[in-house]
């Protein structure tokens, strides 16, 4: 039996709440803190006590419950050093290349600026888990609020270097809309069309599309496929850089 358990649920409208629990120590981390009540309900349902919040970035829909949960549990909040002044209750700052321990599980910090200037993702290499928040979604990526397309492409390239069997938990349930857009960019991709049909069925039943895997995203997510000749030809960008192709795809999604 694996030492780590995860509990996945919705917060607010479409934010994912994720609890990461170590059976041996009893430690429990919330990946971001979008909303207090759903997190408390999940903790009560599982019989867990919250010990950590791992904050990925400063947006309000990811830090809204930091202060109230810290007051209730006396927990430790870890977050990106480049956004520390914007993260309520932060205790420990981390940056790219840092490694820290969560209940005996190594956690690597990957800085992924683009959505925000200091956004980080948390990678647990031994457990094959990535918490990508608003950098990488199933069939999508985050909007560029504080970064350029070049910066975001570099961030996504960092994530693409992870093993294909890495399970990815992302910040929002946007997958159905992402699938509708992805088909317009990559219409001949049979793996994408098959996946889109599965997503339609999953969402019609009220199911969640998280987690995904890095291998699946590399095969079907147009934002990771800027180097694909078919996509480049469809966009008329055969000689453009990968970053420029990515920028065009991001622009089209913004206007979709």
UniProtKB/Swiss-Prot annotation:
User: Which Enzyme Commission numbers does its entry carry?
Assistant: 3.1.2.6
GO terms classed as biological process: methylglyoxal catabolic process to D-lactate via S-lactoyl-glutathione
> What Pfam family is a match for this entry?
Lactamase_B
> Which residues are noted in the entry as Zn(2+) 2-binding?
61-62, 134, 172
Broadest EC class assigned to this enzyme: hydrolase
Cofactor comment text:
Binds 2 Zn(2+) ions per subunit.
InterPro entries, from UniProt? Answer: Clx_II_MBL, Glyoxalase_II_hydrolase, HAGH_C, Hydroxyacylglutathione_Hdrlase, Metallo-B-lactamas, RibonucZ/Hydroxyglut_hydro
**Under which pathway is this protein filed?**
Secondary metabolite metabolism; methylglyoxal degradation; (R)-lactate from methylglyoxal: step 2/2
The cofactor named in the record is: Zn(2+)
Sites where the protein binds Zn(2+) 1: 57, 59, 115, 134
Q: Which GO terms describe its molecular function?
A: hydroxyacylglutathione hydrolase activity; metal ion binding
Keyword field:
Hydrolase, Metal-binding, Zinc
Q: Could you tell me what reaction this enzyme catalyses?
A: an S-(2-hydroxyacyl)glutathione + H2O = a 2-hydroxy carboxylate + glutathione + H(+)
Q: Which domain of life is it from?
A: Bacteria
Give the record's subunit note: Monomer.
Q: What does this protein do?
A: Thiolesterase that catalyzes the hydrolysis of S-D-lactoyl-glutathione to form glutathione and D-lactic acid.
Question: According to its UniProt record, which protein family does this protein belong to?
Answer: Belongs to the metallo-beta-lactamase superfamily. Glyoxalase II family.
Q: What protein name applies here? A: Hydroxyacylglutathione hydrolase
Q: Native species of this protein?
A: Rhizobium meliloti (strain 1021)
Tell me the lineage of the source organism: Bacteria, Pseudomonadati, Pseudomonadota, Alphaproteobacteria, Hyphomicrobiales
Q: Which gene encodes it?
A: gloB
């Amino acid at each position: 039996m694996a030492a780590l358990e995860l509990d996945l649920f919705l917060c607010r409208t479409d934010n994912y709440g994720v609890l990461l629990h170590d059976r041996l120590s009893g430690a429990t981390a919330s990946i971001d803190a979008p909303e207090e009540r759903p997190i408390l309900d999940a903790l009560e349902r599982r019989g867990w006590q919250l010990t950590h919040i791992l904050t990925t970035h400063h947006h309000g829909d990811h830090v809204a419950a930091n202060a109230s949960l810290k007051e209730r549990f006396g927990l430790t909040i870890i977050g990106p050093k480049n956004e520390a002044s914007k993260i309520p209750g932060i205790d420990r700052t981390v940056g790219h290349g840092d490694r820290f321990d969560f209940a005996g599980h190594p956690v690597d910090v990957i800085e992924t600026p683009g959505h925000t200037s200091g956004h980080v993702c948390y990678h647990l290499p031994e457990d094959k888990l990535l918490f990508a928040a608003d950098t990488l979604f199933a069939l999508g990526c985050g909007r560029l609020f504080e970064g350029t397309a070049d910066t975001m492409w570099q961030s996504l390239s960092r994530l693409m270097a992870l093993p294909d069997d890495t399970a990815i938990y992302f910040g929002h349930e946007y997958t159905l809309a992402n699938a509708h857009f992805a088909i317009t960019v990559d219409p001949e991709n049979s793996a994408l069309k098959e996946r889109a049909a599965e997503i339609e069925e999953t969402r019609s039943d009220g199911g969640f599309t998280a987690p995904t895997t890095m291998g699946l995203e590399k095969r079907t997510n147009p934002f990771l496929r800027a180097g694909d000749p078919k996509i480049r030809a469809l966009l008329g960008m055969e000689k453009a850089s990968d970053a420029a192709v990515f920028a065009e795809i991001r622009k089209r999604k913004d206007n979709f």
